[in-house]
């Protein structure tokens, strides 16, 4: 504990520099990926083909592939691709900007979540978490891929932040949980419940103390958030 307290001023002084290094490292990895790696079959090429056929048909509700409805994935990723095409024109590069945004937001969201979970070590952990992700094999494998996985990560992070907020501010926290679940369902289906539901149900073991309204209202709020998220995705 003493060593942590002693390091706290050091982290405060180095935090801006470390954050800049994280951004530079992320940018270098990103530019290398965009410059040296084409869209990978089968997944990336298929998803871009679905987005293009929806755009060509003018049908932005139902995904299409090769003249048939494509029901394998929800439409959120395709909608976001269309939004970028509407802004920057139809191109492969515009579509590949999406994982750029997803990866940067996931770095920030994970660091902020760690700071909220361990506030006594916020200065240090806020700059270490992005480095842990940047050095991880799985994050580096997905951070530039035009797929649904990082979008699902962002939805889970939003729901987790909502759970932390709901401990003390239910009216502010549960809508965030519902949004996270809804976006997760639109991103990759009910698999969003795999990271979110255990955190919700096991809150007495990680929360440290009972939420302000008590545990019965906690679980009632969680149920309403689940219903709201599911309704949002319908």
Regions found by a protein language model. Name each.
Residues 2-234:
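Membrane-integral, polyisoprenol-dependent glycosyltransferases
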